[in-house]
Amino acid sequence: MKIVFMGTPDFAVPSLKSLINEFGVEAVFTQPDRPKGRGKKLGMSPVKEVALEHNIPVYQPLRLKNEPETIEELKNMEPDFIIVVAFGQILPKEVLDIPKYGCINLHASLLPKFRGAAPLNWSIIKGEKVTGNTTMLMDVGLDTGDMLLKDEVEITDNMTAGELHDILMERGGELLVRTIKGILNNEITPEKQNEEETCYAPMLNKEIAKIDWSLSAQDIHNLVRGLNPWPVALTSYDDITMKVHQTRVEKGESNKEPGTIIAVDKTGIKVSTGKDILVIEKLQFPNSKQLFVEQFINGNTIEVGKVLK
């Protein structure tokens, strides 16, 4: 059986390793090397590193859909499966039609919820209690293909996007192996997505990171968790941009304008919101490292009564 793998970041690495160990992988497609670090030296993707360690041929098309010679090489491989995990490119129909059993994508949400580029972040931002991975047969739409298998994961009250990323990353490979075996054994019936249940998870940017203090403390807490470790929720203290890395929710009302700092102690900075109180536990000012409030107030002052914007 021939498997071609397409993926790029850390998230795709455990999936690639699982496929190598279980079935073997014929070829790997990944994004071109990019400048990294302060020296801007070209660095290879995490997926490329693993492929080279296992002596697997690597292809790095700038845009696969615009490279007919590369597509022809892919056709000549006659793959049974093309497995796609965070590749970072849209596959044209010409590629989707190549493998015997189709192109299978691992998507980090319980489809049809949270189609798009940042599903695990938006699952937390929107306050979901359960998410997971879905394997699906790819079509020309954006995460619209028929679903194959799902693996559910609980989102705990203080789980961050970084923590959820690592859980889904590690569990993705096992789900892909089960999916491939299920297809080969005729044990899986593809299921169409219910369009009425869809919602989208657009790419993250710094615009959505600005905290709206008129929201409830729970909604802000979800935003903080969903944007940790990147791009990190932001607010302004005396026109200074402050990153908010960790928070908790306290029940109760302050009757103060949303954003008003109502108390400061070593356990955190208590801030009035549209509903309940948000306690900032870890923060970061410009040109400084992130600190717990207990550390921060040793050398800095946060004034009660100031309004965060």
UniProtKB/Swiss-Prot annotation:
Keywords: Protein biosynthesis, Transferase. Its EC number is 2.1.2.9. GO terms for molecular function: methionyl-tRNA formyltransferase activity. It catalyses: L-methionyl-tRNA(fMet) + (6R)-10-formyltetrahydrofolate = N-formyl-L-methionyl-tRNA(fMet) + (6S)-5,6,7,8-tetrahydrofolate + H(+). (6S)-5,6,7,8-tetrahydrofolate binds at S109, L110, L111, P112. It comes from the Bacteria. One of its GO terms (cellular component) is cytosol. NCBIfam families: fmt. Belongs to the Fmt family. Attaches a formyl group to the free amino group of methionyl-tRNA(fMet). The formyl group appears to play a dual role in the initiator identity of N-formylmethionyl-tRNA by promoting its recognition by IF2 and preventing the misappropriation of this tRNA by the elongation apparatus. This is Methionyl-tRNA formyltransferase.
